[in-house]
Structure formats: C-alpha cells, structure tokens
C-alpha cells in the first residue's frame, strides 16, 4: 500500500529492520492495540501511516477519546506528555525522546514560577506548546485553534498572563482587544520567516494568497490573507477559490495540503537566511524506523509524577470544556 522512496531506502538498511516497514508497523499496531497520532509537521511517510493526523487541539481530543492501549505519538515531547496527562493508564511512546520544542524550552518552570508569583492576581492561560510542569502552573490551556475563543470567555476585569508564545499572545491581544501580560517565548521555526522574501514572492506570484500560523511574527502576519492553526490553514486552502498559496508555517503541512487540494500549488515561505531552515529540527527527529523500534521495544515511554499529571490535567480539562 505504501511504496515511498523513504520506505524503500529503509528496507535495505542493516540492524534487523523488517523488509516492509509499513506492514511491520501495521502488524505491531494490531498486536499492541496501538494508535498512531501524528502532527501535520511530521515527515510524509509518518503522516501516511498514522491513524490520526491533526493540530494540537485535534490531537489532544483524539488522545482523550482513544480506546487503544498504546498511544504512539509522532510529534514532539510536550504533545506526548499531553497524551499521558489525559491517559495515565495507557502506554505512551515517543519515537525519539530528543524531539523537544524550542518554544516549550523557552519557558523554564523555575523562571515561570517566579514570573507568575510577580503577578498574583492574574489568571494563567498557557499555550499547549509547553511542558507538563508549566501546564501544572496554569489555569487554562489553549491551542492556536482556540486561543482567541478561550480568552474571550474570560471576564474582562480578570487580568491574564499568556505564556509561552509572545507572537500568539500578541495575535490574541489584537483579536480580543485584551491587554495580556506576555511571557517572552517563541518558536524558532516561525520566527525564521522573512517578511522581505514573502513580499517578493507575492510580487512574483500576484495571484497567490499568503496564509500564516499565528506563531509567526507580526511583520509576517500583516501580509497574510488568512491566519490560523494548522487545521484552519488546511481547511482554508481547500475552500478558498485561490489556486496558489504562500504557506508561512512548518512545511510538513504541505504534504496534507497537496493531498486535500491536489490541483492547487503551495509555496513554502522562505526563511530570513538561505542557511536557515524553516523545517522544525525536532519534528524531523522522528522517522519511520524509530517509529517501528518504539513499537517493537515498547520504549521510549513518556512518564511523569502523578502530582504533576493531576495538576496539569485540570487546565487541560478546562480547555476541552471551553472548546466545545
């Protein structure tokens, strides 16, 4: 069923890999009663073998609703942690434990605890792209899909800390008119996009629409016809009459865009420097080979203390309730 060049190359590698990785993974899924959840930023082969592909909110909902005994999370560490928070009794596997997140890493728990203590009357709304420890210090979690909706439901007289992404925080401020206290974190991928090069692309492709993720800087967002989460970007490119799009987010999503709108053309937004990469180095640590070995060996497993899990669960549950 799956015959990509990547899979064919892996079949010839030494080290005990099966001849057909895709078939072996499908067999392990049945043996383990496992589900593979993958983010849109994963490499195409992983997206193609996943049981569910989505953005952070969709993946959180899928993790909360699954009947599988094993969750294999093809994403980054905080996403797999989220699955474990919602499913303490299940085995949650991450193909590569080094698949971290520059945004999550930009908000260390000790420093954030001090920041929170300096604003004792503030409600803490944290973007899901943060560690379990930060979630445990939060009142409500949000995603790029529902951040505006979440903040709009909070009484206007209630002051708010928004963490960790300053760019998403600024976008939420613009959309809601609320004055948020922002933690100054950011995503290395979404801050590499070049405003100048996007403008040049728009000149070279006058019929193209620029679409962007709200983690991008304001200088990039101002040139976008549409701003939204990865799921929203996918939906927009299917329904828009435009035939060409400049895409300002991690280019892994273009695989799904091309599958869902095969007659349209998608141009990845270029980075500031030619040597810079707009691919997430952490997302790309996961490979089909690592996915197989994680399932075969039932490791690396995501674990956390029960007190952190319970504290992180409460704001996650509030998000899911407020997003319905």
UniProtKB/Swiss-Prot annotation:
Signal peptide per UniProt: none
Family to which the UniProt record says this protein belongs: Belongs to the quinolinate synthase family. Type 2 subfamily.
Entry keyword annotation includes Metal-binding: yes
Domain of life: Bacteria
Biological role stated in the UniProt entry: Catalyzes the condensation of iminoaspartate with dihydroxyacetone phosphate to form quinolinate.
Lineage: Bacteria, Bacillati, Cyanobacteriota, Cyanophyceae, Nostocales
Organism encoding this protein: Nostoc sp. (strain PCC 7120 / SAG 25.82 / UTEX 2576)
A cellular component term, taken from the record's GO annotations: cytosol
Residues that bind [4Fe-4S] cluster: 101, 187, 280
Alphabetical UniProt keywords: 4Fe-4S, Cytoplasm, Iron, Iron-sulfur, Metal-binding, Pyridine nucleotide biosynthesis, Transferase
Annotated NCBIfam families: nadA (TIGR00550), PRK09375.1-2 (NF006878)
Transmembrane among keywords: no
Name recorded for this polypeptide: Quinolinate synthase
Compartments (UniProt record): Cytoplasm
């Amino acid at each position: 069923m799956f015959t990509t060049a990547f899979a064919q190359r892996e079949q010839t590698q030494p080290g005990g890999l099966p001849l057909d990785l895709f078939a072996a993974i499908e067999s392990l899924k049945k043996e383990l009663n496992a589900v593979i959840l993958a983010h849109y930023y994963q490499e195409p082969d992983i997206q193609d073998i996943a049981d569910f592909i989505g953005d952070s909110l969709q993946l959180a909902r899928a993790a909360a609703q699954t009947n599988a005994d094993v969750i294999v999370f093809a994403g980054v560490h905080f996403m797999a942690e989220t699955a474990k928070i919602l499913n303490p009794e299940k085995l949650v596997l991450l193909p590569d434990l080094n698949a971290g997140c520059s945004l999550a890493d930009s908000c260390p728990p000790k420093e954030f605890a001090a920041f929170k203590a300096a604003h004792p009357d503030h409600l803490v709304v944290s973007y899901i792209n943060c560690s379990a420890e930060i979630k445990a210090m939060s009142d409500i979690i949000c995603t790029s899909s529902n951040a505006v909706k979440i903040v709009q439901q909070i009484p206007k007289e209630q002051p708010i800390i928004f963490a960790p992404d300053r760019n998403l925080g600024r976008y939420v401020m613009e959309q809601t008119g609320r004055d948020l206290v922002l933690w100054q974190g950011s995503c290395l991928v979404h801050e590499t996009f070049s405003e100048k090069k996007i403008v040049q692309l728009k000149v070279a492709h006058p019929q193209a629409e620029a679409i962007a993720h709200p983690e991008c800087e304001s200088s990039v967002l101002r040139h976008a016809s549409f701003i939204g989460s990865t799921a929203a970007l996918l939906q927009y490119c299917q329904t828009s009459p435009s035939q060409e799009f400049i895409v300002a987010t991690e280019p892994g999503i273009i695989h799904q865009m091309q599958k869902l709108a095969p007659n349209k053309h998608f141009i990845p937004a270029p980075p500031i420097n030619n040597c810079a990469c707009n691919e997430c180095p952490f997302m790309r640590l996961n490979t089909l080979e690592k996915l197989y070995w994680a399932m075969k060996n039932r490791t690396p497993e995501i674990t956390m203390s029960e007190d952190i899990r319970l504290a992180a669960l409460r704001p996650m549950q509030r998000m899911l309730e407020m997003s319905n």
